[in-house]
């Protein structure tokens, strides 16, 4: 079983949304998965479940540093770190990068730069991240009202607004996960 850990010390950065979108992708591909929700806020659209012989386990974490986070990081086959691109997100992001540095190169770590838009602040953040952490693998997820609209309908943005930029970004993130972890359709 492949384990995908979605983590960041900061809340409100899109961990649960990404977790749900990965679940939708696995459902489309008919891949058996277990879902573990360590975040007590209950923000997931999908219900927590443990499935016998699951091919993938997805772990959604809370927005706070916990002692057992290191254990989850060690157990994960892939780590996804969503972050917003604001000044307030810099310190928590740098703490996460520091925590994950011992695992860099040993397991895939994807930093999802969430709510990307065309403002100078976003461009400056992206440039800062690229200059200071060029070794980090990143993906962009655009700022869009379609994600919460899709969530309100208990749908993936890929099904709700398939031609949108947000859907394309989610497809790219999911394709990276599938390729990196060698997840195949119908994998059980």
Model-predicted segments: where are they?
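Short beta-strand-centered segment that lines the nucleotide-binding/catalytic pocket of NTP-utilizing
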Residues: 29-44
